[in-house]
Regions:
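Short glycine/acidic-rich loop motifs that flank beta-strands on beta-rich extracellular proteins
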Residues: 166-170, 188-196, 202-205, 226-233, ...
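Beta-propeller domains
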Residues: 87-97, 104-105, 131-154, 164-170, ...
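Surface-exposed loop/turn motifs in large extracellular/passenger domains
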Residues: 149-157, 175-178, 188, 203-216, ...
Length: 659
């Protein structure tokens, strides 16, 4: 995550306090870097033994964009921040705050196990080994980006193949193909060690090209990529029941918006996938008229600022349907209908979000107009943000429908809860008591109702509404009811790990208290789903006399994410493990307790080192220097491959090595 990257900021001021604002200026290609960020082996940026000149810089200086540049100068200052220089032509969008970066590409930087350097001048490869004498070991290098290429292929099935350090691509008119039950281990990486020009910094990733339509990727594992997990440029493809984790450890020089899964085609379906531990700020850019459903996503956007799990930009909102997803424990927005540069009129419209759960995220951000936001449960939003934000800017969202949502805070502003013209806007939907049916606009420091002559004014009154929502803000608003503790209305217990069942309704305050609107929205044909009325666009079956408020009906159960157990290549004990228990899934990098098919690494630096308290089997086991492993009395640890112990293993029970 960013916590392990160096940091620094320019000393210029942003033109706005809008967190979505992007500054396209570059300050002469120079960057200040903090001296107190340390490199493990050489003492820190400020150490005169560390010269960054001639290195490769991976610079997250564009908020949600990261660039790979050649460092052309490094001025070391003993009493102040150092300055590095680079060619400004090597970067795109520049933002003057929240800078993170790391450097590589020099032999002198090698100081940690498994680091390597290639000297182009004499074609020599240097490796800092994890253990042992390299003369007795085999070192392999990646030579092929794509081991399988579909070119004009149709009705081909690729099934049960393990891809290691390679992947596939579909080009030409490759249609109706299936990739199923395949494992993609380290499928893509950049070639920037060879240089930063001619596209070497951009990884060649798993891709369905612009004329690859009606294909299916199902029940596959994608892990430890550099670059996007998937790029999809064709139409009506289905990405279903897959497992993605540890996606993109540099997030640099990616395509377009720079996301983890990049779609530009039309009518693609992304459903029942599990995603966790990603680098890029946004997780899924969906393409036009997409369906995003039954996905489970957590721990995203670790290497860039801004972002969302579902990132609906201007052209990708209309016709999108986002439903029955579970997003939790990420610093990013769970779902966002977005607009560039703070201009709400540039946002997309006619999107639908219904029956979603978000817990401990940056919430749900809705810009634009004519959106349908219904039956969502959004809790514990971070950064003092409102859980559901129906943004009231530039006369927008007055034709948006908001109903049967349960949240702690629902507002028209990112964080404010006053809902007054003199402070921050009232809720923008038409029909609000005492409000405007034409939306609101901010002039100087105050808000007012939109009127004829305003740049964003629409002479047709808004047709949206707010009905039967509940939150914890004790301020009167149409369609919103106050409750002091919404978690108490649910089967909520996050202490045992978050699951979908935590959000089942248990209180009569939300059971049978919803509405089932049959209104037909204006321009109903622009929505995805089976319209034209709201009850068709947002399908919902009542368990009782009326709809329940929130994502679930009482007695209803639905699950998200992949429904199978992946065969991970490597599983690492987390240095942030919350306990010493080997059999606790959250203590492992994959979020799953390892089994006999997995290669296990126990690293140094964990505050809780693993203890085996019941018999287990693994494939290969490596205990790094300064790491420990304890096997309790009466249990057996079986290693079916190689055991490499550079640390300390305490055996009170039994250990069997069957290599």
């Amino acid at each position: 995550s960013h916590s392990t990257w160096a940091q620094g900021d320019e000393n210029t001021l942003s033109d706005t306090d809008d967190p979505d604002y992007v500054d396209d200026r570059s300050i002469n290609g120079s960057l200040q870097i903090d001296e107190d960020i340390f490199n493990p082996g050489v003492g820190g940026i400020g150490n005169t033994s560390l010269d960054l000149n001639g290195s490769i810089g991976i610079l997250n200086i564009g908020s949600f964009k990261t660039w790979t540049v050649a460092i052309t100068g490094h001025t070391q200052n003993a009493s102040s921040d150092d300055v590095i220089t680079y060619n400004t032509g090597d970067i795109g969008t520049y933002k003057d705050k929240h800078h993170y970066y790391f450097f590589e590409g020099k032999l002198s930087f090698l100081d940690t196990n498994n680091e390597w350097f290639h000297d182009k001048s004499d074609n020599t490869l240097y490796v800092y080994p994890d253990y042992g004498d390299l003369s007795n070991r085999t070192i392999k290098g990646k030579t092929t980006d794509y081991s399988v290429t579909f070119s004009g292929a149709q009705y081909v099935t690729l099934k049960k193949i393990n891809f290691f350090a390679t992947t596939f691509e579909m080009t030409g008119n490759s249609d109706y193909n299936t990739v199923e039950e395949c494992n993609f281990y380290y499928p893509s990486a950049s070639k920037r060690m060879l240089g930063t020009t001619d596209g070497l910094g951009t990884p060649n990733v798993t891709e369905l090209g612009s004329n690859a339509d009606n294909n299916t990727i199902e029940k596959c594992l994608f892990e430890n990529t550099e670059g996007e997990a998937l790029v999809i440029k064709g139409d009506t493809n289905t990405i279903k029941n897959n497992y993605f984790h540890h996606i993109d450890w540099s997030a640099s020089e990616l395509q377009g918006l720079m996301v983890s899964i990049y779609c530009t085609g039309t009518s693609n379906i992304f459903q029942e996938n599990t995603i966790h531990t990603t680098g890029a700020s946004a997780t899924v850019l969906p393409g036009r008229t997409s369906t995003f459903s039954y996905n489970k996503v957590t721990n995203t956007g670790l290497l860039q600022s801004d972002g969302a799990v579902f990132q609906g930009t201007k052209n990708y909102v209309q016709g999108s349907v986002v439903h029955h997803n579970f997003i939790y424990d990420t610093e990013k927005y769970a779902f966002r209908y977005d607009a560039p540069g703070g201009d709400a009129t540039q946002a997309g419209s006619y999107g639908i979000m219904h029956h979603n759960i978000a817990d401990n995220t940056n919430g749900l951000m809705i810009k634009g107009n004519n959106q349908i936001i219904a039956h969502n449960t959004i809790l514990n939003t971070i950064n003092n943000r409102n859980d559901i934000i129906i943004l009231s800017e530039d006369c927008s969202n007055n034709s948006t429908y908001l109903y049967n949502n349960l949240a702690k805070r629902i507002g028209a502003h990112r964080s404010a809860t006053s809902f007054s013209l003199t402070s921050d806007s009232p809720m923008p939907m038409a029909g609000n008591a005492g409000g405007s049916n034409y939306g609101y606009i901010k002039v100087s420091s105050s808000w007012r109702a939109c009127q004829s002559g305003d740049s964003y004014y629409n002479a047709t009154a808004g047709s949206g509404s707010s009905q039967n929502n509940i939150d914890e803000i004790n301020v009167s608003r149409t369609g919103l009811t106050y409750n002091s503790d919404v978690e108490s209305l649910l089967n909520y217990n996050s202490g045992d790990g978050k699951t979908e069942s935590d959000y089942h309704p248990t209180s009569n305050t939300i059971i049978d208290q919803g509405v089932s609107p049959t209104t037909t929205p204006s321009n109903s044909g622009n929505y995805g789903g089976t319209g034209p009325a709201l009850n068709n666009l947002v399908p919902h079956t009542n368990a009782g006399s009326a709809a329940d408020i929130g994502a679930f009906e009482v007695g209803e159960s639905w699950d998200t994410g992949a429904d199978w157990s992946p065969k991970f290549y490597k599983v690492i004990w987390k240095t942030s493990a919350g306990s010493t228990a080997w059999n606790t899934a959250s203590n492992w990098s994959t979020g799953v307790v390892p089994d006999a098919d997995n290669n296990i690494t126990i690293p140094a630096g964990a505050s809780n080192m693993p203890v085996v308290s019941s018999s287990v089997s693994v494939k290969n086991l490596t205990v790094n220097s300064s790491a420990t492993l304890t096997i309790n009395s009466g249990v057996t640890l079986t290693v079916n491959g190689n055991l490499v112990n550079m640390g300390n293993i305490t055996v009170n029970g039994e250990i069997n090595v069957n290599n």
